[in-house]
Amino acid sequence: VLKQGDDERFRLLNAFKDDTGSVLFATDSFWEGVDVPGDSLSQVIIVKLPFDVPSDPVFTARSELIQQRGGSPFMELSVPQAVIKFRQGVGRLIRRGDDRGVVVCLDRRIMEKRYGQIFLHSIPDCKRMYAPLSEILGAVGEMI
């Protein structure tokens, strides 16, 4: 079991690539510039949709500008930025034509909120399942 913060990023990635039985726990910062083709990466688990922190000063300033012109900061800024990060996370899994794997998103909002469809439509077509976690785990076990 490897986790972000235990070692330098490049060392963690090398250890993860070298041991196909390892598990790497990391935040969305590992979604950019990471290439782990082949059997080392077979699953990506997204615990929550990657929305930016609304208290960030740059985010707050952009939100205020959108609001001043009568727009929706959530739909015009928060959702598009989160969708880009989400696509990056999903994109870690399939890097070559022969790669296969499973993405599990544990955030119910992807299915229960109207904006969740924007996330789903942003990724390539694939088999999708919305079910209790126990059923999802069983299906993942069969796929891998």
For each of these PLM feature ranges, what is it?
Residues 1-144:
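ASCE RecA-like P-loop NTPase motor cores
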